[in-house]
From Swiss-Prot:
NCBIfam families: PRK00773.1-1
Name listed for the protein in its UniProt record: Large ribosomal subunit protein eL20
Key words of the record: Ribonucleoprotein, Ribosomal protein, RNA-binding, rRNA-binding
Record note on quaternary structure: Part of the 50S ribosomal subunit. Binds 23S rRNA.
GO cellular component, one term: ribosome
UniProt xrefs under Pfam families: Ribosomal_L18A
GO molecular function terms attached to this record: large ribosomal subunit rRNA binding; structural constituent of ribosome
Similarity field: Belongs to the eukaryotic ribosomal protein eL20 family.
InterPro entries: Ribosomal_eL20, Ribosomal_eL20_dom
GO BP terms in the entry: translation
């Protein structure tokens, strides 16, 4: 069964760290991390070594903050 994973982290190497929070509906926690590294790397042109993951947690559907993920969950 799919889980909702929230990843909090920061991107280093710029003038000041950029803090982010991402949420994913995935089967495994590793899938969420891989997707996050891929998205952040392509969107912000940073290598994985400059992405610092601060927290990875499983959350309930009620705790979802991402509007896109909320709409996706409502469809199912």
């Amino acid at each position: 069964m799919a889980k909702i994973i929230r990843i909090k982290g920061e991107i280093l190497g710029k003038d000041e760290p950029m803090v982010f929070t991402k949420e994913y509906n995935v089967v495994k926690e590793d899938d969420a991390l891989e997707t996050m590294y891929s998205e952040m790397g392509s969107k912000h042109s940073v290598k994985r070594a400059y992405i610092n993951v601060l927290e990875v947690s499983e959350i309930s559907e009620e705790d979802v903050q991402s509007p896109i993920l909320k709409k996706t969950l409502e469809m199912y």
